[in-house]
């Protein structure tokens, strides 16, 4: 499965370094408007990009900003979102299996989102 990366932010990142981290393609939305993390600005721009690019899977970092932004984007795209994943797998049908602790960390839930993009 090909891996792509979307960088959203001001022009202060080493784009070549992003490509060295395993992404086959690096997409960029560069603007000084993104210098301050503001959920609604990021949300609107990222939803537009995701609708156009049509990725099967979208993953977010478990940062404070990622935890605030991801559910807004999932709601805007009318898809599911699984938070706090500890592992991922791709099943025989090519769907993302999202693994996360459940029931006070006594078991691990294996979750699949039924529509694209699958988000975690």
Language-model region placement:
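N-terminal glycine-rich FAD/FM-binding segment characteristic of electron-transfer flavoproteins
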Residues: 1-120
């Amino acid at each position: 499965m090909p891996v792509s990366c979307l960088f959203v932010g001001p022009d202060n990142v080493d784009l070549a370094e992003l490509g060295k981290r395993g992404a086959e393609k690096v997409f960029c939305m560069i603007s000084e408007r993104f210098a301050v993390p503001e959920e609604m600005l990021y949300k609107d721009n990222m939803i537009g990009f995701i609708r156009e690019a049509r990725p099967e899977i979208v993953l977010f970092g478990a940062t404070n900003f990622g935890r605030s932004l991801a559910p807004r984007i999932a709601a805007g795209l009318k898809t599911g979102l699984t938070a706090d994943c500890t592992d991922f797998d791709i099943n025989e049908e090519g769907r993302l299996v999202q693994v996360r602790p459940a029931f006070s960390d006594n078991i691990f839930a294996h979750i699949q989102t039924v529509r694209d993009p699958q988000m975690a």
